[in-house]
Amino acid sequence: MNKKKILIGTDTVSGIAPQILKAISLASNENSLPYGEDIYTKKCRNIVRKIFEKQDLEIIPMMSGTASNSLALSSFLRSYGNVLCHSESHINKDEGGAPEFFSGGGKLLSISNSIGKLTSKEVNEKLDELNFKGKQNSKICGISITQLA
């Protein structure tokens, strides 16, 4: 019996679905305006605006999860700031320092526990600890809630 190996660690280790490859191939034969003015980005933007019922909503299509996460974090994380996250979170373990690089030196400040997810109690304790230390502390700019329990 032949068994096919399945890699589930990330979507970047496998090929793409035939339907996606066909759509990309067809689109590559067209001439389009750049910088979000192509018909595909416009269609996507309109769909997202309809879903969120917000006509001035903007989207930025990205090519990878690391780019997406780094851009999102760098939009509010400054060189003097921190983002709280779990020590086992994807942004802390798998982004290779990209969020810190693209934010100009902002820092991911991790919290560890045995369940692999942040709890509101731990977040509040960390915020209290940082507030107690005073003004020389880096500012908390955000909390990664992807691993919130």
Predicted regions and their residues:
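Conserved core of the PLP fold type I
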Residues: 56-77, 111-113
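PLP-dependent aminotransferase-class I/II
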Residues: 103-148
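N-terminal amphipathic/basic leader segments beginning at the initiator methionine
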Residues: 1-23
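Conserved N-terminal alpha-helix of the aminotransferase class I/II PLP-enzyme fold
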Residues: 17-65, 87-88, 93, 98
